[in-house]
Amino acid sequence: MVPILIGFFVFFFVFLISGMALLKERISGTLATPVKRSEIVYGYMLGYGLMALAQASLITVVGIKLLDIEIIGSIFSVIIIAVLLGFVALAFGILLSTFASSEFQMMQFIPLVVVPQIFFSGIIPLDSMADWAQRIGKILPLTYAGEALSAIIMQGAGLIDVGKDILVLMIFLVVLLILNILGLKR
């Protein structure tokens, strides 16, 4: 359960900060510039991506040291998965901020995103749940990050061994980037 909690905290904190930042700029009118929507999205992904990189790395290292977790695999692999999940959370936060018209409304999206991640991503074992609940889990990015983190931390898997999970997370990232570019309002 500890590996998926690392992923959960990375997802939650990056999602929260990224969504609020873009929304604040959109509401204040500072996005009304002649740049393309794709440039805004890529700029946010780059700028906040550096923050996501630092935050994911910090949460991972502090979580492992603070909880005295024994890692059978590579800590570098754990950080790679956490950072990739951080980028997915960043893109997801930006996407949801395009639908919000106020910070209060953005805060209302948080339970809609966080609660399913808690119940259906593997924090509570999916194999003990009904089929419909397991299907919901298969459409959540934290499920794949949790599986990869668990395999690396508890079984010593390498990045090649969790390639399917990495591929799914990358697909989530690309789809979310495309949706961000198409859906961004100024």
Can you describe what each PLM-predicted range is?
Residues 30-33, 60, 98, 143:
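Residue-identity detector for threonine
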